[in-house]
């Protein structure tokens, strides 16, 4: 586990606000526990949350029975544009295999406390997504579920809904909203099949060579450069924080 993970983009969690308001939840107590009014972050593209705030958010919301499907709803809302530069870079790729490589390279810009590793085998590609930072079981499982569902949403959009069957294995046990996962076919979910907390996605070769409709090599080059600059800035910010911490000891 890596303790030096930068703060996490707030943009994903902000997507829960409309749903919570639709469910007529009073968020006053939650905002007090977080020490901030999340709704004020909506217009801040680079707003961040600490892991402690995310732990508080998840544990508070999942206390309510009506919110047991929040991971599913959050994941389902994650279209490619939710990932900003990385999402647009994926859309600009030539084919699925190239897109998976780009996703792996810049996954820390999407979810910095998780890692995506892509392994190419005979006739199949395996995506391994696992945490880089220690967190409570409740928070970890929430994120694993949301990331898995979010992948389905983004993958279907990337292929313009022309997706062939593929398999998603998770370490978490079957959730109460399992019937809702039928909406994500042809993805097939397999729960409780992994020992290590993680997700493994198996994509067959017949999905990999699919040409993407918005492929644009010029745009991809520019977007990747911007992604690299963001990674460099995050690394620099981390070094500055480490230096300040050292000086204050």
Please describe what each predicted stretch is.
Residues 50, 84-206:
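N-terminal regulatory/effector-sensing and dimerization cores
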Residues 181-249:
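Extended mid-to-C-terminal alpha-helical interaction segments
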Residues 15, 56, 60, 98-102, ...:
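Long, highly charged amphipathic alpha-helices
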Residues 3-12, 123-124, 130-136, 140, ...:
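Surface-exposed, interaction-prone regions with an acidic/low-complexity signature
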Residues 1-125:
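N-terminal low-complexity or simple alpha-helical regulatory segments
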Residues 23, 68, 110, 158, ...:
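Solvent-exposed amphipathic alpha-helical surface segments
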């Amino acid at each position: 586990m890596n303790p030096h993970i930068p703060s996490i983009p707030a943009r994903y969690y902000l997507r829960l606000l409309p749903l919570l308001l639709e469910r007529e939840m009073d968020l006053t107590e939650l905002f007090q526990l977080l020490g901030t009014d999340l709704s004020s972050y909506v217009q801040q593209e680079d707003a961040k949350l600490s892991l402690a705030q995310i732990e508080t958010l998840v544990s508070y919301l999942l206390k309510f029975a009506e919110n047991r499907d929040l991971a599913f709803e959050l994941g389902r809302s994650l279209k490619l544009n939710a990932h900003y530069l990385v999402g647009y870079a994926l859309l600009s790729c030539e084919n699925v295999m190239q897109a998976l490589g780009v996703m792996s390279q810049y996954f820390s810009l999407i979810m910095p406390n998780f890692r995506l590793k892509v392994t190419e085998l005979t006739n199949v590609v395996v995506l391994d997504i696992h945490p880089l930072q220690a967190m409570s079981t409740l928070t970890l499982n929430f994120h694993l579920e949301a990331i898995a569902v979010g992948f389905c949403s983004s993958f279907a959009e990337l292929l313009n809904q022309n997706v062939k069957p593929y398999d998603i294995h998770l370490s978490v046990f079957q959730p109460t909203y399992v019937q809702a996962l039928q909406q994500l076919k042809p993805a097939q979910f397999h729960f409780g099949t992994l020992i290590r907390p993680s997700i493994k996605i198996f994509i067959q070769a017949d999905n990999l060579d699919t040409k993407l409709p918005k492929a644009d090599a010029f745009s991809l080059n520019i977007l990747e450069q911007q992604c690299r600059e963001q990674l460099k800035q995050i690394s620099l910010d981390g070094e500055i924080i480490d230096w300040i911490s050292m000086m204050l000891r």
